[in-house]
Amino acid sequence: MIELILVIVILGILAAIAVPKFAATRTDAQISKGRSDISALRSAIVSERQSRLIKGDHDFINRLDNDVDANTEDVTIFDSNESLSATSPKLLMYGLKTKDAAGHWLKTDDNEYTYKFGSASVTFTYYPSDTTDDNDDFHPAGSFDCDHTDENCKKLTQ
C-alpha cells in the first residue's frame, strides 16, 4: 500500500515538473515554424524578383496573395498574387491556410499578415515599393518585416 502511495506521489511530482516544460516546448515549436515560414517567404520574394529582372520587369510583386479578404479563415495565402497568370510560377508552391489560432497566419489587411504563437501575435507587412511609415522608418521595396522594437518580432526574426 505504501508503495502505491509513493508511486502516486512521484507521478504527481513528475507531472508538476513536466507540464510546464511541454507547454514551453509547444510555443518554441510554433516560433520555429514561424521562423521557417518567414525565411521561405522572404526567399520566395527575392526569387520572384530575380525572375522578373531577367524578364526586364524591375518591380517587386504587388501582393503576396490572390486578393484574399482580411480576417478570413481557411483560405490560402502566400501562394500567388494578382499580377500572376494561372500559368505563371507561384510565390510559394504550397501556400499556407489561414487560421486565427496559435501557429498559424491570418491576413489582417492589404499586405499585412499576423502570425500567432502561444498567446502572442506579430504583424508583418509586405512593402511592394520603397515606403516610409508614420514613425519615419524606411522599408525598402520587397521587404516583409515586422516592428523590431517588439520583443515577439525579435523572437521570429533574430
Segments (PLM) and residue ranges:
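Short, surface-exposed interaction loops/tails
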Residues: 114-158
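Long, low-complexity, serine/threonine/proline-rich intrinsically disordered regulatory regions
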Residues: 77, 85-105
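Short, glycine/small-hydrophobic-rich surface segments
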Residues: 45-89
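Aliphatic-rich helix starts adjacent to a transmembrane/signal segment
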Residues: 21-39, 52
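Short, hydrophobic/aromatic-rich segments at coil-to-beta transitions
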Residues: 107-114
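N-terminal single-pass transmembrane signal-anchor helix
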Residues: 1-27
